[in-house]
Amino acid sequence: ATVDGKTYSHHIKVGFSPEKLRPYTTMPSDFKEFWEKEKAEQKEFPLTYTKEHVEKYSTDKIDCYLVKLQLNKRRQCVYGYLFYPKKEGKFPVVLCPPGAGIKTIKEPLRHKYYAEQGCIRFEFEIHGLNPEMTDEEFKEISNAFNGRENGYLTNGLDSRDNYYMKRVYLACVRGIDFLN
């Protein structure tokens, strides 16, 4: 679209007959029990985190903190930026996990309007990558995945107990625990 001489472009995704979509795989008979057990085991581990003020992303309206959230007794962690309004009061909370890919949080202020408009926002990454690391440090770590951007998606796929994404899903639950 062109508005006032400036061209804007964006993409959208739509589903054709989404009501006709059917699962490709069968849900395991113990699916709910498995996840309830995993979440209960995670709750046994104390909620442990550090929260460090990040001046460069704070403004006169919002505060930003870098959070390191420990997930489990294996000391696996995720990092995220926690933004919230400087004004007093209770605020709704927005939990923002990333899209696919191995990356750090590059532009934390791109969604600052959430906090400016009165929401607490926790944007986190799922791989344990400190967003304050240098590009060189990131390159060294990503080489561990043999340069395959999404190699983690099949890491441990042969076992639901060892599947990489199990930790990711539980990290999302832990993020909610942290925000509560």
Where are these regions (language model features)?
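Short beta-strand elements
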Residues: 5-33
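Short beta->alpha connector loops
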Residues: 26, 74, 100-103
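N-terminal cap/lid segment of alpha/beta-hydrolase-fold proteins
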Residues: 29, 40-89
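Short, intrinsically disordered, charge-balanced linker/junction segments flanking boundaries
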Residues: 34, 177-180
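Conserved hydrophobic/aromatic pocket- or pore-lining residues that grip, position, or stack substrates
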Residues: 35, 172
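Short beta-strand element of the alpha/beta-hydrolase
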Residues: 79-84, 89-100, 110-111
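Cap/lid segment of the alpha/beta-hydrolase catalytic domain
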Residues: 100-170, 178
